[in-house]
Amino acid sequence: LCVPANPNVTSGWNAIDAIMMLTEGRDGRFESGDALPDYVRSGNEPKQITVHCRSGRPMLAKPTAKVEPITDVFWEPYREALRACEPNHGMLKFHKDIWCVICEAAAASLSQSGTDTTSRDVEEWFRGWSRYKMDEAAARRAMLQSYDVATGVRPIDIPFALGDAWRRLYPLIVELVSFGGLAAGQYKAFQQVAMEMERIAFGPPAESVAKLLRLMRDGVVQLSDQTDAPEGAVVVNAVIASPSQADETGPLSQLILRGDVEVDPLTQAIRVSDSGNVLGGRKGLAVFGRATEGWVVGNDTLSRTLHSQIQNWAGTIAVEMHG
């Protein structure tokens, strides 16, 4: 990042990589401490990094090896419950058909660990989490709680169990929702939940959360729900653009304008087949990745097995070439 030493820097909440580049990447050091690592400044980092987020809700820590995982057999009944929804693809109601299974799985995993919990308890916690803004103190408490749970210092709690259930069942969620699996008017409900579950289930490693907490305690990083950066600040946009924010002068926008690709009106994503070929547009054109997000769910994943479109496309090309 081309940011000089000692200015004030402001960035989006998906900014942990940028924060680490501006601190640890500039010869700052994290050393072993008691509960959290200590940070030794190099003098090359910004004076202060302000992270802007409208909701104030933070990313929570992923579990470490210190938390004993639930055996894969435990999740099978919930996978079966989701598979039972497959015949209704195109008519699925997100809360009734999918979200209720996730909450039941989370409650059962908590009960198995010794904390009697119902799916209603899980749903009420999630409503409370997603409904209100968090100030910096509340966000720090949530992060610290998630770090302690992820490292085995505290017993697992509802956000941990809910994140675990979402991760374990995510491949089936992707199958059910992708390619227009939800009924009319249901995508917004899914999108709102999925956005929050990114924070709860797919947050940074616990080690990174600990580093961020230390930087916050030392005043290097602060959280803000204000949208305007202070005068003179260097602004880093660390938020991934949405699928509908294609460069107006780029090739994708031109393809849309010419009608070579078709945009799904509900998700604003490019509509494609299971082999990536565009629907309702030019034959022989395939699109993969974030431009299809919403029509195809979960393109930002690091998993190589979650989506099969590229392999399917390669198979169709091989057939065309070799008969």
Task: Please identify what each model-predicted range represents.
Residues L1-M321:
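Flavin (primarily FAD) cofactor-binding/catalytic cores of flavoenzymes
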